[in-house]
């Protein structure tokens, strides 16, 4: 039976707080082959019985993944119900589904500049706020009349906040409102809170922390980067049965006081003094929660409503809870808690103590060669959490307004003897659905894939950060763009990246240059840091996040809305590069190039590949992607213009970086990788370039010496040019430098440096030695797309037409992967058994694929498929369903 599943809105199942009409999509499920949608009927209504229809449209189309409901008009702060019915052709004949289960989305304020009336209120003292990182609380009582039908709270803060109604935390969200360039864009969250209110007197309250807004942040460790006063704003809309609406807004009538959070910052952790608690403080006033002199009037803080933007999904919350594996005493006498996994988040403690006693932990990543806590790589970050008791009791507590990167926790203070049961790690990251899994016969590669995934989890906390542990944790654009494709294989990152790309665009400089970190917290401090002073923005491979990430998202999800929204930003970046060319080559200030490559001069972070070469390669790539985006959007004039820009950039690359006999002027691995991967090698010199890359690899005994820009593409540059064995050999290297070396050293996430920990247990320089740095995990895309073999046919997007091309090798007995696409799940497995290779493939309904076997494959089983040779490979065109074929290789 054919059914509709997973109706979504803007790639989310149940978004709350949309400020626009969403894009719709759905998936089909059926137990027969060749399912192809021919027609759909989409309805949107105000009630779950669909009696109050707002939209009812039937379309003859196969489109099921990026459907626009033209003519649908939405209202602010309203719940909507949607359902879809589908007609399809199948191998069993035409079929029609029943209506899908109703799916729900809720709108935010569609025009906050006009509709937002709430003021930002603060309980901080103007005399002390600039130096304070203490928390505060604000609250106010309000009355709800009988007949309440719905209630929606729109909330945000300058700083971090948790909001409560009648003593109950409104949501499980953490670290709200997230991190943006607050002076340009501030997100607000929308919550349906009907069930939390009752007729009569109610109480609203919020607790605030310094967060990214005013705490110490950035390479210069500056504070008050966006302002010096935390403030909270709430606009609570009450909708009554008769249709009338009223609002409860923050304003001067609210009251404030100090919170038991006496200190909280992103880098340094949090301290909590239970003596300052007010029990039931966010409930209606009692003598207990309203002691004389404790609450005082708030003051208002101006903020333009026009800069507010709704956040409907992708918010940070506790995604996993990991119990401690052991508590042990290190050789130096330190008491250490081990959670067995490097991660980002907090530690929840359950502890018994008496008044004045404290429980204090310091989170860290690694043990040194002697088995003692290794803290040096945290630099100035204190990463400490402390709870001080007010009376004799047992408490369960975790920080609210900070997070740490850690596997271990050093017990600094503890009443009694700590046991594993006292500690639970709470993993924090932005909400994302899993999108794929890769496994193979080599356990070390499986652990590598695990490490890559945990690098994503640890660094996708509202923004794509470089690392979660030290005093940095910034949204480096280069790291983000090189990891983006891998991230999309692992998780549904559409919402996460879409949010961050808006931040990138608003932080773009007037000349079109892109900041090296987004949000650009460093923009007013560049003179205080050597790197930022010499390379304040416009770094190739970093700024190209403006073009690469939107294009990758379009390719992976097939939704051109990301190109439409980001196209002005993409164009400004390419025009910035065009305006800063000298003799045909992009040249702007100091460039970072192949950052931390192993072929760098001793003591330098700059790889041996000339930055002029890496800059020109990315200039050509970005111009090409912009031309392709313009083509998708129907902008023929721009498509032709930037195609010419790309051709000229490629010609200038060849003229400057190839000699007359076809040798590259830079004899580095990265130079050859980028030339091949970006299509910048003149065809007549392609084989020579491939051969020279193999020679450079052999000179290093099969090891890479590449940095940030070369490493992500190394395996693909080999395999896509026929060098499969070398690609597998590179991936499977077990000694330094290589991906599996880290695994054998006990890594549970990907490291910043290939030798972060050396075989003798000594460490790389503590100044830059993160053990949770996802950049080199970009090789994950190769595992899914090349090793397992799930790819797309040229000229397509969103996996409407896949190319399933398994390529056994490397001595692996089997490999398998699945990937969740807008159409549903693709799965591919290959297995080698005594010379026989068996391939099992699954294609979701309404999609199609080509199964492309290895050149020289001699078919044994075809499962009814017809294979014909294409480009030297036995190839079969298939529609949805499950297939199993087998073959041997001709000798």
Predicted regions and their residues:
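Alpha-helical support elements that line or immediately flank enzyme active sites
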Residues: 151-155, 165, 346-365, 401, ...
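Non-catalytic C-terminal accessory modules of carbohydrate-active enzymes
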Residues: 224, 228-235, 247-286, 309-315, ...
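Active/binding-pocket-proximal capping segment
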Residues: 161, 170-172, 177, 504, ...
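Active-site-proximal structural scaffolding
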Residues: 35, 98, 135, 156, ...
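Active-site acid/base region of carbohydrate-active enzymes
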Residues: 160, 233, 251-253, 257-258, ...
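Conserved, charged catalytic cores of large soluble enzymes
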Residues: 106-110, 173, 617-635
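Extracellular/oxidizing-compartment recognition motifs
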Residues: 1-79, 83-470, 478-479, 495-496, ...
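C-terminal capping/lid segments that line or modulate ligand- or cofactor-binding pockets
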Residues: 204, 208, 272-273, 279, ...
């Amino acid at each position: 039976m054919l059914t509709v599943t997973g109706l979504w809105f803007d790639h989310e199942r149940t978004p709350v707080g949309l400020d626009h009409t969403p894009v719709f999509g759905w998936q089909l499920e059926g137990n027969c082959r060749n399912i192809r949608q021919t027609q759909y009927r989409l309805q949107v209504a105000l009630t779950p019985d669909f009696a109050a229809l707002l939209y009812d449209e039937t379309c003859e189309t196969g489109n099921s993944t990026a459907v626009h409901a033209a003519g649908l008009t939405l209202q602010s702060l309203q719940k909507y119900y949607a359902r879809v019915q589908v007609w399809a052709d199948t191998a069993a004949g035409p079929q029609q589904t029943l209506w899908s289960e109703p799916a729900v989305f809720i709108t935010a304020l569609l025009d906050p500049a006009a509709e937002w009336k709430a003021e930002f209120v603060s309980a901080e003292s103007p005399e002390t706020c600039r130096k304070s990182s203490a928390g505060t609380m604000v609250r106010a009582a309000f009355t709800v009349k009988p007949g309440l039908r719905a209630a929606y709270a729109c909330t945000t803060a300058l700083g971090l906040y948790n909001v409560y109604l009648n003593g109950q935390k409104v949501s499980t969200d953490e670290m709200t409102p997230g991190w943006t360039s607050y002076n340009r864009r501030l997100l607000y969250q929308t919550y349906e809170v009907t069930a939390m209110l009752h007729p009569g007197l109610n109480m609203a309250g919020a607790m605030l922390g310094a967060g990214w807004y005013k705490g110490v942040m950035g390479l210069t460790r500056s504070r008050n980067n966006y302002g010096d006063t935390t403030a909270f704003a709430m606009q609570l809309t009450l909708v009554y049965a008769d249709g009338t609406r009223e609002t409860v807004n923050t304003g001067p009538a609210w009251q404030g006081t100090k919170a038991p959070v006496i200190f909280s910052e992103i880098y340094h952790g949090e301290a909590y003094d239970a003596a300052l608690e007010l029990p039931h403080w966010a409930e209606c006033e009692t003598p207990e929660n309203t002691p004389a002199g404790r609450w005082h009037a708030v003051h208002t803080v101006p903020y333009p409503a026009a800069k507010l933007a709704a956040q409907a999904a992708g918010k940070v919350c506790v995604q996993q809870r990991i119990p401690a594996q052991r508590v042990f005493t290190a050789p130096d006498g330190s008491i250490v808690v081990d959670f067995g996994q490097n991660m980002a988040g907090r530690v929840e403690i359950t502890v018994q103590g008496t008044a004045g006693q404290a429980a204090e932990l310091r989170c860290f990543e690694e043990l040194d060669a002697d088995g003692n806590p290794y803290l040096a790589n945290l630099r100035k970050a204190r990463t400490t959490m402390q709870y001080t008791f007010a009376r004799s009791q047992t408490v369960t507590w975790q920080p609210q307004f900070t997070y740490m990167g850690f596997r271990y926790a050093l017990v600094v203070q503890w009443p009694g003897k700590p046991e594993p049961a006292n500690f639970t790690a709470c993993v924090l990251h932005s909400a994302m659905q899993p999108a794929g899994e890769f496994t193979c016969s080599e356990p070390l590669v499986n652990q590598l894939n695990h490490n890559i995934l945990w690098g994503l989890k640890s660094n996708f906390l509202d923004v794509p950060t470089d690392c979660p542990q030290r005093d940095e944790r910034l949204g480096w654009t280069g790291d983000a763009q090189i990891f983006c494709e891998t991230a999309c294989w692992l998780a549904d990152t559409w919402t996460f990246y879409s949010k961050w790309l808006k931040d990138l665009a608003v932080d773009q400089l007037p000349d079109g240059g892109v900041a090296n970190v987004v949000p650009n917290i460093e923009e007013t401090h560049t003179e205080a840091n050597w790197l930022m002073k010499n390379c304040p923005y416009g770094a190739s491979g970093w700024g190209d996040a403006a073009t690469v990430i939107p294009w990758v998202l379009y390719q992976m999800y097939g939704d051109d809305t990301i190109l439409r929204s980001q196209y002005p930003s993409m164009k400004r970046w390419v025009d910035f590069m065009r305006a800063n060319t000298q003799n045909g080559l992009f040249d702007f200030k100091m460039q970072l190039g192949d950052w931390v490559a192993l072929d760098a001069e001793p003591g330098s972070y700059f790889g041996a590949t000339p930055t002029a070469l890496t800059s020109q390669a990315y200039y050509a790539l970005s111009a090409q992607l912009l031309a392709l985006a313009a083509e998708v959007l129907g902008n023929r004039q721009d498509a032709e213009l930037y195609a010419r820009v790309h051709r000229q950039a490629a010609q200038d690359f060849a003229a400057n970086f190839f000699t007359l006999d076809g040798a590259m002027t830079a004899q580095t691995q990265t130079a050859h990788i980028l030339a091949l991967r970006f299509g910048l090698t003149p065809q007549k010199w392609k084989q020579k370039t491939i051969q020279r890359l193999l020679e450079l690899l052999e000179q290093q005994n099969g090891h890479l010496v590449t940095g940030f820009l070369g490493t992500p593409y190394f395996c693909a540059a080999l395999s896509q040019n026929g060098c499969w064995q070398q690609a597998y050999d590179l991936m499977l290297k077990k000694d330094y430098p290589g991906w599996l070396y880290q695994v054998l050293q006990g890594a549970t996430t990907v490291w910043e440096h290939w030798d972060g920990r050396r075989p003798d247990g000594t460490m790389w320089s503590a100044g830059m030695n993160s053990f949770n740095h996802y950049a080199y995990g970009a090789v994950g895309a190769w595992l899914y797309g090349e090793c397992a073999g799930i790819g797309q046919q040229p000229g397509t997007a969103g996996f409407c037409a896949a190319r399933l091309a398994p390529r056994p090798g490397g001595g692996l007995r089997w490999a398998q992967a699945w990937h969740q696409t807008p159409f549903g799940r693709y799965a591919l497995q290959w297995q080698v058994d005594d010379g026989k290779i068996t391939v099992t493939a699954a294609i979701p309904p309404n999609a199609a694929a080509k199964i492309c076997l290895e050149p020289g494959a001699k078919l044994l089983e075809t499962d009814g498929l017809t294979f014909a040779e294409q480009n030297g490979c036995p190839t079969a065109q298939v529609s949805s369903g499950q297939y199993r074929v087998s073959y041997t290789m001709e000798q």
